Amino acid sequence: MNLFRKYKHKDGFTRLVQPGEMGMRLVDFGLLNLKDGRSFKEDTGKNEVVLVILSGRCRIASGGEEWHAVGGRKNVFEGRPYSVYIPSDSEYTVIGSGDVELAVCKAPADSKRKARLITPEDTNVLSRGRDNWYRDVYEIAGLKKDTEALIVGETISGPGNWCSYPPHKHDLEEAYFFKVNPEQGFGIQRVYTDDRKLDELYVIETNTVVAIPEGYHPLVAAPGYSVWFIYVLAAGQNQVLEAHNDPVHNWLANAKKE
């Protein structure tokens, strides 16, 4: 099963992951690129949506609310993001304030919440792992904090470091969208199950996406390059997020620090 796709930059919205493809049933993910003054309008339907500004600024309106000059990062490696939550059965409009790139994250939900701006200060900053599997995590939304079903965040792994390690799974659908710094760099992503009915290995580069319908999903950044990715999970109405380590490698969780 192919779980990999490469995004080719273009103006407007590009859907990269959707239900019915790559083993996915719930997660819907795409990229929105707008020039100054250009707009994009959408009805969320039965999905709730989290818009994450990856770079640039924009104006976003929904549910009688309007936020101006949202964003400001030059790129995803420069600090925490601005994001906006949009509930199901709502319309929203995005207008570029200069060039802007957004991640559009969706999952089915019966949401009664209101549209809301999520500032960098609202994100939860975590440092996970140790040794050469240390990474920084920005928890943007989820676990009943801002959403009903979606869990969205960003992770940055330093040169030569591993993520999602020791290898673990969540028993939830996920999608990862990547950027690498410097841009010509790369990393490696593996997705596999205990019985190896699913066992895929991909070279991840800037603007690539990997769908994770199930299984363990460790990844590593090549030496000399940092890997950033946005993660999108569909947790369902219960929003239970548990990490289950691969039993073969679980000894690492209790090993002495190097």
Question: Can you name each region flagged by the protein language model?
Answer:
Residues 4-5:
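Non-transmembrane, aqueous-exposed alpha-helical and coiled segments at domain scale
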Residues 9-41, 131-175, 186:
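A short glycine-rich, His/Asp/Glu-containing loop-to-beta-strand
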Residues 29-95:
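Extended, compositionally biased flexible segments
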Residues 44-45, 96-98, 169-170, 222-225:
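Short glycine/proline-enriched turns and hinge-like loops at secondary-structure junctions
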Residues 45-68, 86, 171-208, 220:
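Glycine- and acidic-residue-biased ligand/ion/polar-headgroup-sensing regions
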Residues 77-97, 107, 203-224, 233:
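Conserved metal-binding segment of the jelly-roll/cupin
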Residues 88, 96, 104-108, 141-142, ...:
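Short, structured patches in soluble enzyme cores that scaffold and shape functional sites
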Residues 100-138, 192-193, 230-258:
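Double-stranded beta-helix
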